[in-house]
Amino acid sequence: SEGYPVYKQNRRQMIEGNLSYKQAMEELFGNLSVRYSRSTTPYTPYQQSQEGYLISSYQEGENNRNQFSISASLSKGISWIKGYIFLDAAYSDSRSLLVRNDLKVPNAQRTWHIVPRLETDLFRWLTMKYKLNYAYSILALEDEETATRNISLNQQLSLRFSPFAKVSMELVAEHYHN
């Protein structure tokens, strides 16, 4: 089959607010961001069931997508560990439309992210960094009892050895889970 050219452009409107906080002498920093956006595309995702398979494509027709997101970050220096702790968190709610088997189906996707980190100089010659990245998302189609859920977890640990002023060696380990 052959596609057709789309001469229309995407449109997007967005409003965003940001709030920052810092106490430099206490090594405390924070940030909060809130965003709402609305976009319109000249095509709509299209899904058709054929012989037990779900065929995905696009069809001509405007599709509106509304998205709300909020994110926050916090960091704090801690002298007794000679380092910093960080915490990043985010939430997003996105709503749009798709066409499945010639029926318009509203859908919503919600995503949560949490990312704690630790960076510390255990000794003058040894630096440790640890990061955990956790994400959870749900895709729900209106009028369907089940929703698609996805969980992912990623951990990373790095150790940097610096036995001499101009020599360093780093060991990195990662673990993934989906």
Where are the predicted features?
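Exposed, low-structure sequence patches enriched in small/polar residues
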Residues: 1-178
